Amino acid sequence: MSQNVISQPVEAQQSFARAVTESLPGLLLVCAVALVASFVAPKLEAYPLFKTYLSLKDFILAIIFGIIIRNTVGVPAVFQPGLRYSTIMTKTGIVIMGSSYSLAGLVSVGAQALVFIAVFLFGTALVMMWLCRKVGMSTPLAACLAAGMSVCGVSATIAIAPAVKAKNEDMAYSIAVVLMFGLLALIAFPLIGKVFNLTPEQFGAFAGVGIVNSAQVLAAGFGFSQEAGIVAGIYNIGRVVFLPFVVLMLAIMAAAQEAEQGNEVAKINKWQMIRDKFPLFVLGFLAIVCLNTAGVLTKPEVKMAKHFMEWAFLLGFASIGLTTRLSDLRAAGLNGFLFGFGVAGLKAALALAAVLLFMS
């Protein structure tokens, strides 16, 4: 009995040490890509093209360099375990980002943000379900596309899939469409922001509702400017807060469509779905905001937190790039690309129009 009790902590320590050892090569690769991106970005600013139009700051370059490495020389298996932490890194950055806001500042940005987000999220989801039905797509595929294109990209697609009994092919198709537009948005959105001379607040809102995938929202926002990245982050948080409610709406719509077709439909537990899909890291962000509002964080600590936030995002984006396989985008095919790009492009155009009209 006592030997078993003693052996458990030892086994846990060995397991932790093994996980660290396995993850180390990948984490070092992520750090190397992030460092190269942070070194190259200021050099590009010396060229008028990049300074005036193409905002290829380190956040965007980290993703681009990662993608180039992954899809040219490849990433050997020994590095794979260390690339699993992209989501943890980006969510850590979002939590730390709370140090940049007080409750009053959050409310001033958040009130308008919630209106924009609600209109675009639910509007996009409803339009996508209607369009997909018109072109004859299956209900599960339609729900996956609607969630991915309206809320937060890949995460939303994964969240809705079990609720609508989506197949792996449905998820792959939806994720491919989301990633294709997200990669294009990394370059196009900052360029559009410069052409229309958007303020950081305007661009943050534009990226926050116009770009499909969460990681690209943050990368494009910080790629435009530090202030725009913070605002885009607030919009991104608002989007993921709405995630369980959009998933619930789509699940109910999908169930209704399946019932119309005479298929058996499982009962939906609404409160359990909302609870299970709620993003807990948002609570961490709000906790940091409250600490900053209460004056617990000193100015040096806030400055240090800003550096931690930047590096958390930079490492997360590098990891995302290193795990992005362009071959996976073939799952959507040409028709899927055109369909998804058309909807995402329309959403982006409407987002730009709304920002110019209501935030001038």
Curated annotation (Swiss-Prot):
The chain crosses the membrane at residues 20-42, 57-79, 100-122, 142-164, 171-193, 203-225, 232-254, 278-297, 310-327, 337-359. InterPro entries: UPF0324_pro. Its main location: membrane. The keyword Zinc does not apply. Keywords: Cell membrane, Membrane, Transmembrane, Transmembrane helix. One of its GO terms (cellular component) is plasma membrane. It is found in: Cell membrane. It comes from the Bacteria. It is a multi-pass membrane protein. The keyword Cell membrane applies. Belongs to the UPF0324 family. This is UPF0324 membrane protein DVU_0123. It comes from Nitratidesulfovibrio vulgaris (strain ATCC 29579 / DSM 644 / CCUG 34227 / NCIMB 8303 / VKM B-1760 / Hildenborough) (Desulfovibrio vulgaris).
